[in-house]
């Protein structure tokens, strides 16, 4: 089916990236709430669930939006900029934008109109936070959702 190969590559890259650091012992249910996800998106969501350590996900009730928030320990040389370089090698057309005001350094990137991800580096503790959306109606909506939610979650990282 169209997009399946691209999706498989994205999933493989995300899994490889997630496995690059061990999980952070932070209660993700205190990092982001269903109410905050609903406020940012303007949609109703099912309760969050944790598909793996260091990640919480929310699925829209009766809709396509899916939100993921992850916090992972970051190796000394790893950063959003090294992730940007890897992404550009794998998918040269990917547009990466710097986002100010979240963590020490943050980037937003998307490979399709309905997908968006914001990743931010934090130093104390040395972790990377990622907020992702799938099922957005437009590129602008995807960027708005992950940026607004990252601004809510970011100040709580490591607290």
Where are these regions (language model features)?
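Cleavable N-terminal signal peptides
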Residues: 12-13, 23
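Sec/Tat signal peptide C-region and signal peptidase I cleavage site
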Residues: 19-25
């Amino acid at each position: 089916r169209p997009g399946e190969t691209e999706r498989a590559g994205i999933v493989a890259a995300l899994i490889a990236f997630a496995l690059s650091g061990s999980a952070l012992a932070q209660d993700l249910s205190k990092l982001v709430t269903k109410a905050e996800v609903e406020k940012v998106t303007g949609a109703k969501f099912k309760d969050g669930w944790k598909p793996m350590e260091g990640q919480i996900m929310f699925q829209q009730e009766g809709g396509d939006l899916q939100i993921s928030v992850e916090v992972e320990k970051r190796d000394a040389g790893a950063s959003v900029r090294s992730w940007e370089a890897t992404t550009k090698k794998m998918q040269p057309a990917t547009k990466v934008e710097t986002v100010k005001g979240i963590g020490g350094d943050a980037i937003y990137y998307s490979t399709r109109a309905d997908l968006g991800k914001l990743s931010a580096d934090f130093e104390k503790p040395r972790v990377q936070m990622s907020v992702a959306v799938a099922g957005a109606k437009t590129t602008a909506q995807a960027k708005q959702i992950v940026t607004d939610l990252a601004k809510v979650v970011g100040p709580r990282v490591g607290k």
